[in-house]
Amino acid sequence: MILDKIAASTKIRVENLKKEVSFSFVKSEASKLVNKSPFAFEKAVKDGELTFICEIKKASPSKGLISENFPYIDIAKDYEAAGAGAISVLTEPEFFLGSDQYLKDVKKTVSIPVLRKDFTIDPYQIYEAALIGADCVLLICALLDTDTLKEYIKIADGLGLSCLVEAHDENEVKSAIEAGSRIVGVNNRNLKTFEVDITNSIRLRELVPSDISFVSESGIRTAQDISALRRIGASAVLIGETLMRSGDTGAELAKLRGSA
């Protein structure tokens, strides 16, 4: 399963990072930071309107190379200008060809919150996310049990970081809620088969209490998809490949937002 391969690769990456910069140092430096906009990401998805979280990614395991030239700073500017409420930046280097530098540069470029889209399997990565300027970290229920989710949310809370807790099925949604998640994202992509079906969000929406922000992720391509998710009361949609492949990310976002 590809998720297991990514997690194994990430574990090696984090262990190598710890040899370069110790866990105690990263934790200490992150803890010294003064977060001037704590929990900015969750405020963005709670504003009462359907929030568009727009993704910047160069490649993916399922689709290969998505953007060869990859003018990520221009894309970030276009997203913000077209009305994005937040930006998701892939930082996983092996399978998504991501980089922490992309997030640092995007954060300097835009005024909207930025999600670090990576595969969090170690507390080190949460402190690291704070240091590179992220407003939110991704926690994937398929990789983390309920107790670990609780632990990671507590660490993020102490840093003023939001957590987007991603689930794919009923049990994972329940785990996310039990862990105290304030933002639950339902991934419409089955990470075992890579099949995409937005009815997964529609089916699982009723399990998420109204005081928890609900984000639909993956496979959102059309005005009809947006309308369907708006009808079920989604707080936000996370859209990546549809925008990245469009040729004009800003215009495509404006088109989708106009349908909301």
UniProtKB/Swiss-Prot annotation:
PANTHER family: INDOLE-3-GLYCEROL-PHOSPHATE SYNTHASE, TRYPTOPHAN BIOSYNTHESIS PROTEIN
Keywords assigned: Amino-acid biosynthesis, Aromatic amino acid biosynthesis, Decarboxylase, Lyase, Tryptophan biosynthesis
Coiled-coil annotated spans: none
Record carries keyword Kinase: no
Lineage, broadest ranks: Bacteria, Bacillati, Bacillota, Clostridia, Eubacteriales
Name recorded for this polypeptide: Indole-3-glycerol phosphate synthase
Reaction equation(s) it catalyzes: 1-(2-carboxyphenylamino)-1-deoxy-D-ribulose 5-phosphate + H(+) = (1S,2R)-1-C-(indol-3-yl)glycerol 3-phosphate + CO2 + H2O
Family in the record: Belongs to the TrpC family.
Gene Ontology molecular-function annotations: indole-3-glycerol-phosphate synthase activity; phosphoribosylanthranilate isomerase activity
